Amino acid sequence: MGGYGVIIRPFVNFAVGMFIFLSGYLTKENENGVYRDIIYRRIKKIIIPYIIWSFIFAIVNRRINTFIPDVFMSKCNGIYYFILIYIQMVLLIPVTFKLLRSRFSKLGWFVTPVSVFLIRYISLWFNIELGFPFQGELFVFWFGFYYLGASLKNGYINLQLSKKCLTNLCLFSLVIQGVEGFIWYWIGNFDMATTQLKMSSIITTGLCCIRAYIYIEAGDLNLNEQPVILKKFLKVLGDNSFGIYLSHMLIIRILNKLVPMVNIFPINAIFVIMISTVCVMMAHRILGKYAYVIGV
């Protein structure tokens, strides 16, 4: 993919951080400080589908013999590391709110940038090869986005930035991310050139999260005011998002085998979203009340 990949990545690097942010944003603080029920519900909802789909990919990848360690380290499917991160964030809900209420609340904002700098940049300086969980599976890389979402939702911070100013900051940070990406690319480190876990990417993602928050709170995202087709599309996409996430890598592999000529971004992305959505909806209809088992 080369330089093309370096150009494209800044426009998609915010995805995981944004989902983590939204998870924090959708978490309401309990006055009694007890979160057992929400922790149980959230983990129960994802753990069985994760194991089942991991097993499917273990079969496809012919790695049945290593399934047990692979499922614990999200190695059955590379993108499933998000589920491990999500589980860590859910387990940390009580800690998150205790930190927000404490006089040390500002420390929460340093967890992610300091971790990225110490683990990603310093390891490169000393030529230390990183393995699991320091390639992105550890909560410290993403905690800042969850902390931001929980802070905004529960009134711990109040932002006064205009939408125009924030949009300009997002665009400027995208340029900076592209510049840093090409610097790493010219050095010969394609991983750092495209990763979400570099300083410029963290800043861009944080700004995009804040922009999304202002967009939602300002009422700009009102589905009732959107064109009917767009409204239906967004609703279908939202209702089936988890199933699409779990299955779309399998759809990509099948498409690459059957019609390799469509493996060009953004054509492949459009095809994958459409086919994945249809497959998830069909599976939901066929399985009925048991659809939750595979996350559809």
What are these regions (language model features)?
Residues 4-16, 70-85, 124-145, 178-208:
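Interfacial loop-to-helix transition and helix-capping segments at the boundaries
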Residues 9-18, 29-78, 84-89, 168-169, ...:
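Transmembrane alpha-helical segments and their boundary/interface "anchor" motifs
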Residues 20-27, 88, 92, 96-99, ...:
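Transmembrane alpha-helical segments
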Residues 28, 57-157, 255:
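Hydrophobic alpha-helical segments with transmembrane-like composition
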Residues 54-59, 112-125, 170-185, 250:
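Aromatic-anchored segments of alpha-helical transmembrane domains
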Residues 140, 157-235:
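Alpha-helical transmembrane segments and terminal signal-anchor/GPI-anchor hydrophobic tails
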Residues 213-238, 249-296:
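C-terminal "closing" transmembrane helix and its immediate cytosolic amphipathic cap
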